[in-house]
Amino acid sequence: MRRLNRALSGRRLPDTALEEITEVVHILADRFDAGTERSKLDDMMTRPHLAAIYSGQYTPLDLEVGEEIEFDPFSLAAGEFHPASIGLTFTKESDDSGVGKGTIDPMFAGPPERVHGVIQALVIDEVMGALNRMRGRQAYTAYLHIDYRGPAPLGEAVVFRAWVHETD
């Protein structure tokens, strides 16, 4: 799906191709809509460290610096199960910091040649969430304020960092 999403958003296609894609997608959607509905929580509970957190066991992940943090498999930023995932990876930088890295595709453009601001906010939120997961904590964003200092480029490697400033 990700490959198709990127191909459709990044290529000029004739109307006949779009009509063909629409027809095939409707046929597949009708077939898949008849299937069993998926539960994100049930799927997340198949991952031992996620099941532990959702069961109230807040244990830090046993990761070395540079190892990947598995956050949310359905995450728009990095989830392997999300059909439009940006495809970022989250890694441990230290016991109190994490990094999100990747290349953001033109599918996520705001202004020409720039990453949409809401995508930047999403990635910042997800990197902070991955850091909490790594530290064995569960938290939800109550407030997120961003002062954008400049545009983020599309199609180039980007790095987002999160660190613990204070814990209540």
Enumerate the language-model features and the residues they cover.
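Non-catalytic linker/capping segments at the edges of enzyme domains
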Residues: 1-101
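Flexible, active-site-adjacent loop/turn segments at secondary-structure boundaries
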Residues: 74, 106, 138, 152
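Active-site helix/loop of acyl-thioester processing domains in fatty-acid/polyketide metabolism
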Residues: 93, 97, 115-138
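Short, structured beta-strand/loop micro-motifs enriched in basic residues and often containing a Trp
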Residues: 139-143
